[in-house]
Amino acid sequence: MENLQSSLPGWEIVRCIGSGSSGKVYELKKKDEYGGDFHCALKVISVPGSQKEYDEMLSTMSEFAMRAKLREKVEEISSEYRLLGALRGHPNVVNCEDQMIIPHENDMGWDIYIRMELLQSLPDYVRENGMTVESVIKLGSDMCSALELCRENNIIHRDIKPQNIFVSRYGVFKLGDFGVAKASAIRTSADKVGTYSY
């Protein structure tokens, strides 16, 4: 956490919002020019994801091959940010503001920081508020709007599920987590990705 804080001058880490197989998400805040607090979310992805993954890779390949494999993984993750850049500003897609790739000092690997707007996940929203008929219709309409934008930009999300849908404080539903999304021109329908149960 100290390394994370030192990499984010001007920002204060408020809390860890959640974690999963792809990394952790933190709430950050900083003072805006009017003295108020500005909040955002920071997705932190480490490559490799754990010491165990590092050790397993090192036991099966050369250091040169491992470095190339890890760089390839960093590039894949960075492509999520580039895809979101093409969709930036749309009201129904999570807005990503910034990305940093920071190499580990003492060993092989990188940390990727993706700063984005702070939102509530759909499952958390439903637990706290429930869903009216009107909000279900709005959810459907907002997701159709997000998917139409993806189609216009030749992007296939490939992992739409409640955990990848977010809600703004104004009740706007947004599609996020484009970690397995790809430009459709370079994929085939035979590629199997995403969450199996969805």
Label every PLM stretch briefly.
Residues L139-G140:
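Activation segment signature within eukaryotic-like protein kinase domains
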Residues V14-S21, V25:
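Protein kinase glycine-rich loop
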Residues R151-V167:
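Catalytic-loop of the protein kinase fold
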Residues D107-S121:
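Conserved short submotifs of the Hanks-type protein kinase catalytic core
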